[in-house]
């Protein structure tokens, strides 16, 4: 079995993007001719001529020379065809080695035993090339996540755990003193400490806060929920996310364990004191 490719170097570099896949005429797969088919045909012809001309009306020497002439002609034609095939194969190999695929013909003779497997690989490659231009949807994303062995499944958060996270009304920081104009009390003492440290670290930064879930700017007076990683979001945006994922959308930090770990650290510090 032999594969014939007719194309240019630009087709290979562009990944056959110029309509190569729909046109199957560019890739031709056909069976190779038997090696001894022409020799058998000429041999049968010689035998027929010998049987027809083998009569007493013609001298034996003439028949012998006629048979030898036909045999030599058949051998010459067969050698010429073989030389043409070898020359074409050598030219294709030279063009492949030099990287010049400008309308050249490359013939690869494949044994019939692996022809079926090679055809299956070509069909798989054609399918992969066809999927390159397709857009991925949510189903493809979930499939890739399921195939990822390093992706550890995260548990969702309950309503009690979500309500335990601190919330407050968003207030713009005063640029002169760097402190907030007004601020609601947090739900726990550890949350207040972490929020105070977060507000102190925000001095000199931009006052605008953007919710990474809805990608909208947080305005003054909106309810903002703070995660243990100190990332802030709209309460209405982050709550549905936490019910499904239980992690921060920005840094993937587990939100259901952050405040508990911080409380344990504070308790250990108070016990040591």
From Swiss-Prot:
Pfam families: zf-RING_2 (PF13639). Induction: Up-regulated by salt and drought stress, but not by abscisic acid. The up-regulation is stronger and earlier when the roots are colonized by the endophytic fungus P.indica. InterPro entries: Znf_RING (IPR001841), Znf_RING/FYVE/PHD (IPR013083). Residues 55-56 are lumenal. Its EC number is 2.3.2.27. GO terms for cellular component: endoplasmic reticulum membrane; intracellular membrane-bounded organelle. Disruption phenotype: Longer primary root and NaCl and ABA insensitivity. This is E3 ubiquitin-protein ligase SDIR1.
């Amino acid at each position: 079995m032999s594969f014939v490719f007719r194309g240019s170097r630009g087709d290979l570099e562009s990944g056959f993007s110029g309509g190569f896949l729909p046109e199957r005429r560019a890739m031709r797969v056909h069976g190779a001719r038997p090696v001894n088919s022409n020799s058998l045909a000429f041999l049968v012809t010689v035998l027929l001529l010998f049987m027809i001309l083998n009569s007493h009306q013609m001298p034996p020497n003439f028949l012998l020379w006629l048979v030898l002439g036909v045999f030599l002609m058949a051998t010459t034609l067969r050698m010429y065809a073989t030389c043409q095939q070898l020359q074409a194969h050598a030219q294709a190999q030279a063009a492949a080695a030099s990287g010049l695929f400008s309308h050249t013909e490359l013939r690869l003779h494949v044994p019939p035993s692996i022809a079926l497997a090679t055809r299956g690989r070509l069909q798989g490659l054609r399918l992969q090339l066809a999927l390159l231009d397709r857009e991925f949807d949510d189903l493809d994303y979930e499939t890739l996540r399921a195939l990822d062995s390093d992706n550890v499944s995260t548990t969702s958060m309950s309503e009690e755990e979500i309500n335990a996270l601190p919330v407050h009304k968003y207030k713009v920081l005063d640029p002169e003193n760097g402190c907030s104009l007004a601020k609601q009390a947090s739900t726990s003492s550890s949350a207040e400490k972490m929020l105070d440290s977060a507000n102190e670290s925000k001095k000199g930064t931009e006052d605008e806060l953007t919710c990474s879930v809805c990608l909208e700017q947080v305005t003054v007076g909106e309810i903002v929920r703070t995660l243990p990683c100190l990332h802030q979001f709209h309460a209405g945006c982050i709550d549905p996310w936490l019910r499904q994922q239980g992690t921060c959308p920005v840094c993937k930090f587990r939100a259901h364990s952050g405040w508990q770990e911080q409380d344990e650290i504070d308790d250990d510090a108070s016990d040591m004191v």
